[in-house]
Amino acid sequence: MSQIIRSNKSIIPSCDVSDLTKLRTLVKETCSVDGVGAYKIGLELALRFGIPAVVSEIRKHTNLPIIYDHQKAATDIPELGEKFAKAVKGADAVILFPFTGPETEIAWIKACKKAKLGVIVGGEMTHKGFLESDNGFINEKGTFTIYEIAAGQKINDFVVPGN
């Protein structure tokens, strides 16, 4: 997948709702809004209803890309990348936060690309206590290295702090 979203600027509604009825309403009411470029689904819907059912509900109303955010996918061993890529079948792209190191990051990116998934990589989160400078576990250099490795793997889409 070369470009996840077809436009240079877009809105990506985050479908963090608790059931398929609320998802249906959200998608129906936004899919024709100019500027909506994709939909982001997360683990609440995916684990409760399954990715195929969630994707099917969205596809009833739009063919816009569906981005799956597993709330920190790529934080496990490198070998699970291929299993993850198979498990998210139906999504067009995934968000990875590879905090477990370069081996995992590269393996998961390669597995997702092999499965024809778009890849978006995040390295920094903005909640209190995340970064070492805010008494968190993750140091600032590590987050920068995550982005550098992803760019080296030809990733062009990133989750970056907006504040």
Which role fits each region the language model picked out?
Residues 1-68, 72-77, 89-90, 149-156:
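Conserved N-terminal beta1-alpha1 strand-loop-helix module at the mouth
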Residues 7-8, 75-76, 80-163:
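Conserved anion-binding
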